[in-house]
A protein has these predicted regions:
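Short, surface-exposed charged micro-motifs
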Residues: 71-72, 97, 132
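Short connector loops at helix/strand junctions that flank enzyme active sites
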Residues: 67, 76-78, 91-95, 101-103
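Tight coil/turn sites that cap or link beta-strands
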Residues: 77-79, 120, 128
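A short hydrophobic beta-strand segment most commonly corresponding to one strand
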Residues: 93-99, 122-124, 138-151
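A short beta-strand-loop-beta hairpin characteristic of the jelly-roll/cupin
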Residues: 99-118
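Non-heme Fe(II)/2-oxoglutarate
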Residues: 1-66
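Conserved short histidine dyad/triad with adjacent acidic residue
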Residues: 72-90
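Short beta-strand His + acidic residue motifs that chelate non-heme Fe in jelly-roll/DSBH
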Residues: 82-84, 106-108, 125-126, 130-137, ...
Length: 151
C-alpha cells in the first residue's frame, strides 16, 4: 500500500478517541464489520464538519473533481470485512482512505496486494477491485473515507 499524500489527522483522532463505539447504532455486516450509523445525533454532524479541512487538502490532488459520500468505517479487533468488490462503483470514481487508528495487524487486502494503511497518510482505493480487511490486532481500525468523482 503506497500512500499518495500525508495528512494531519490529529484532531480527528482526538475526537474519535472519546467515542464508545458500542453506544453508536450499528450495522453488523457479514464478516463482523462494525459500521456505526453515522447520520445520528450521536455526533456524525460534529465529526463531518471536522473532515472539511482534510478533504479540502486532499482534493487539491484531484483537479476537476468533487468529493462525494463521506464515511467512517470501524473494524473491531478480531473482525474482518469479507472479500468483495463494489460492483456499483462507477469507473470515474475512486475512494480515498484516511486511516485514523490502526495497528500492525490490521491488514487491507486489494487484489493480491496486502499491507497496513498507516494513520497520517491518504490512500487511493479502486473499490471495483476485490478487497477485504482483517483486523488481527487488539485495537480498532478506524478509517475516514470519501469518494472522489469527476464533475
Amino acid at each position: 500500500m503506497i500512500p499518495f499524500a500525508a495528512v494531519d489527522v490529529a484532531d480527528l483522532v482526538e475526537w474519535i478517541g472519546g467515542i464508545d463505539w458500542m453506544d453508536w447504532p450499528q450495522q453488523n455486516l457479514p464478516g463482523g464489520e462494525l459500521k456505526p450509523a453515522m447520520m445520528t445525533d450521536l455526533g456524525w454532524h460534529g465529526f463531518g464538519a471536522r473532515t472539511d479541512r482534510v478533504v479540502a487538502a486532499l482534493m487539491a490532488y484531484f483537479h476537476g473533481c468533487e468529493d462525494h459520500q463521506r464515511m467512517l468505517s470501524v473494524v473491531m479487533p478480531g473482525h474482518s470485512i469479507e472479500s468483495h468488490r463494489d460492483e456499483q462503483a462507477p469507473a470515474w470514481q475512486t475512494r480515498v482512505h484516511v486511516p485514523l487508528t490502526s495497528n500492525d495487524r490490521a491488514l487491507f487486502i486489494l487484489d493480491n496486494d496486502m499491507g497496513v494503511m498507516r494513520p497520517g497518510n491518504a490512500y487511493l482505493v479502486d473499490t471495483r477491485a476485490v478487497h477485504a480487511v482483517h483486523n488481527g490486532g487488539d485495537t480498532p481500525r478506524t478509517h475516514f473515507m470519501f469518494d472522489v468523482r469527476q464533475q
